[in-house]
Amino acid sequence: MKKIAIIGAGISGLFIANLFRDNQDYQVTIYEKNTSIDLDEGYGIQLSTNSIKLLNKIGFNTLENKDKFHPDKIDFYTVKPEKKICDLNISDFNSFDCKYTTLKRSKLVEFLKDRLEDNIIKYDHDIEKIEKDNNQIIITFNKSIKVICDHLIISDGVFSKGKSIISNNEIKPVYNNSIAIRGNISRKNLNSLNEKNISLFMGSNFHYVIYPTNNDNEASNFIGVLKYKLTANELDNYILKLQ
């Protein structure tokens, strides 16, 4: 039996572990630096039909309809003045069992996590070193914990410590002078927006998108991207917090 170590218990790490769940040829363990997985409500996520096709292989189609939403179109607007430009009918790309989907990120993480045995995820494991000895990989975590595996999958996010270790810090994210703002907006404050669609507003220095994340009458998800230049000190502090 081959041992697979997955670094990071985010969406990608949990999804990969689910793919190997019933394969008796592999023993999969996820190593997560945090002490638990955050299942707070959080923000929304959009999944293309290709994503849904992959997720359905591990039972995503069994998720209750009330916990997800299938938008009909993307409505494009200008920010100033607020005026609709056009729309794109994304439902044209849907099939019976693969539909463009929006939902809360926490709901997707919960679905992926609940399909795995509790002992698959090892918390409070912060990767520090990766070494190779013949055909085996030796991983050193905090508290001098060592793990030996046959295959290593690194999926610990954009500010990946695992990738930095492998590349000797040669791989670093590039800041493009933009920041993301996330939140929720009450549906009663959406004025004339079509609640069945994704609304995308485009401005010179600020784009934002609003969309529902389930079929309940809850607040819609909001995410905006704003042009904003962080100082070198602010950027260093931000990266350190995420590592």
Predicted segment positions?
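Beta1/beta-strand and adjacent pyrophosphate-binding region of the FAD-binding site
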Residues: 1-12
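Conserved N-terminal helical subregion
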Residues: 2-4, 21, 48-186, 229-242
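Residues at the starts of beta-strands that form the adenosine-phosphate
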Residues: 3, 26-27, 219-221
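Conserved Rossmann-like nucleotide-cofactor binding loop
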Residues: 12, 36, 159
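Glycine-rich FAD pyrophosphate-binding loop
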Residues: 21-41
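Short helix-loop capping/hinge motifs at secondary-structure junctions, enriched
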Residues: 187-194, 216
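Active-site substrate-recognition segment that forms the wall
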Residues: 196-232
